[in-house]
């Protein structure tokens, strides 16, 4: 065995024995560093005769290249092994229970929870979910819903308007979710049964009002629906949502441009204590507004009011959340206070009483 072969064998054994990047780098320096074994032999080429140099040069350079290649392969192997070790130490078992510290566990916001409860109740009764844009046109927000230009009912809405755009149109933030009723009626054929939860915007702010609030509206359009059906629907919803066996309701005459007749619905309750109790007591609390869809609204979407009829209603999601779960100030809903959310929020698997197997 020649000196070159013996040197290559020694270096290869040292590379194989290196078990971390620091040891591997030491082998490289010992072989190819400024005073390394291969570097010293390469320096000696200058002292050789030309004939000897022509023979030894390619051999030494070949050795250098082979050692560099083996070193790079071992370096990559050690890096992969180090990464595998790190990943195995940092693996998170997603089947483990969540941490118990209040600041480390997430909570579902009451608004999100109540929206899910509302959707669950109405979909169980055959309704589908509809959605629409928050930024609306004057036509969908007012005109199509029987609010003509200059109509005094427009004063009921303190509206956020945008600047007039390039085509002369002035967009606005929707003041109710009713525009989705028009958009749905334009696209779908009757019969229609939809609910529309979403954000709405009005210039109002106090303990019970917010410039942005959540509303759910519903719409039923067919050839046979009556006020009796509407009254049954509201009674059923209130019993399910407030989790009571029975409720007393009263329907008071009111006015909404898009319904005729229009009504406001009160639910009987007990307000004598620190919280509102439904299904008992002698007090009354307004819960929603409703009515039969106005013939002008039906005509605006191409339906014959002599053939089709239906009813619509709307209620504030924030308001009924406050009533059901005893939250006194609406403004706290939007303060991003984790302490408030930890107190009033819901765990991921919390379910209301009207769901079967709620404790599973």
Curated annotation (Swiss-Prot):
What this protein is called in its record is Phenylalanine--tRNA ligase alpha subunit
Enzyme Commission (EC) number: 6.1.1.20
The record, for InterPro entries, names: aa-tRNA-synth_II, aa-tRNA-synth_II/BPL/LPL, Phe-tRNA-synth_IIc_asu, Phe-tRNA_ligase_II_N, Phe_tRNA_ligase_alpha1_bac, Phenylalanyl-tRNA_Synthase, tRNA-bd_arm
Q: Which GO MF term does the entry hold, naming one?
A: ATP binding
The UniProt annotation places Mg(2+) binding at 260
Gene this chain is encoded by: pheS
The annotated subunit structure for this chain is: Tetramer of two alpha and two beta subunits.
Using the UniProt record, give the first listed, main subcellular location: cytoplasm
- Membrane-crossing ranges are none
Tell me which UniProt keywords the record has, alphabetically: Aminoacyl-tRNA synthetase, ATP-binding, Cytoplasm, Ligase, Magnesium, Metal-binding, Nucleotide-binding, Protein biosynthesis
SUPFAM superfamilies in the cross-refs: Class II aaRS and biotin synthetases (SSF55681), tRNA-binding arm (SSF46589)
A GO cellular component annotated for this chain's UniProt record is: cytoplasm
Name the needed cofactors: Mg(2+)
Tell me the protein family, please.
Belongs to the class-II aminoacyl-tRNA synthetase family. Phe-tRNA synthetase alpha subunit type 1 subfamily.
User: Cofactor stoichiometry and binding?
Assistant: Binds 2 magnesium ions per tetramer.
- Taxonomic path: Bacteria, Pseudomonadati, Pseudomonadota, Alphaproteobacteria, Hyphomicrobiales
* Root EC class: ligase
């Amino acid at each position: 065995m020649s000196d070159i072969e013996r040197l290559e064998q020694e270096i290869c054994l040292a590379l194989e024995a290196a078990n971390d990047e620091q040891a591997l780098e030491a082998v490289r320096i010992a072989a190819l560093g400024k005073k390394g074994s291969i570097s010293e032999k390469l320096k000696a080429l200058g002292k050789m005769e030309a004939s000897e140099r022509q023979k030894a040069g390619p051999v030494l350079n070949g050795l250098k290249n082979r050692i560099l290649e083996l070193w790079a392969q071992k370096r990559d192997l050690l890096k992969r092994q180090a990464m595998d070790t790190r990943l195995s130490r940092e693996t998170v078992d997603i089947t483990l229970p969540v941490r118990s510290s209040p600041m480390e566990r997430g909570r579902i916001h009451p608004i999100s929870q109540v929206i899910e409860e509302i959707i669950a109740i109405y979909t169980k009764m055959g309704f589908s979910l509809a959605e629409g844009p928050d930024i609306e046109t004057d036509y969908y927000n007012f005109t199509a819903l029987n609010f003509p230009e200059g109509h005094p009912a427009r004063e009921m809405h303190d509206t956020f308007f945008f600047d007039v755009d390039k085509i002369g149109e002035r967009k606005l933030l929707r003041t109710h979710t009713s525009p989705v009723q028009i958009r749905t009626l334009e696209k779908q054929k009757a019969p229609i049964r939809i609910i529309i939860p979403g954000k709405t915007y009005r210039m109002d702010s106090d303990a019970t009002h917010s410039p942005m609030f959540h509303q759910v509206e519903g719409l039923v359009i067919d050839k046979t629906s009556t006020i009796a059906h509407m009254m049954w629907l509201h009674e059923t919803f209130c019993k399910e949502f407030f989790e009571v066996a029975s409720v007393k309701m009263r329907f008071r005459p009111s006015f909404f441009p898009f319904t005729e007749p229009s009504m406001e619905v009160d639910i009987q309750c007990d307000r004598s204590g620190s919280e509102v109790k439904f299904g008992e007591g002698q007090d009354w609390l307004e819960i929603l507004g409703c009515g039969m869809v106005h013939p002008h609204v039906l005509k605006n979407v191409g339906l014959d009011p002599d053939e089709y009829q239906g009813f619509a209603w709307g209620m504030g999601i924030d308001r009924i959340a406050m009533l059901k779960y005893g939250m006194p100030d609406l403004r706290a809903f939007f303060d991003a206070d984790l302490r408030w959310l930890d107190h009033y929020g819901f765990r991921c698997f919390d379910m209301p009483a009207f769901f079967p197997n709620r404790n599973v």
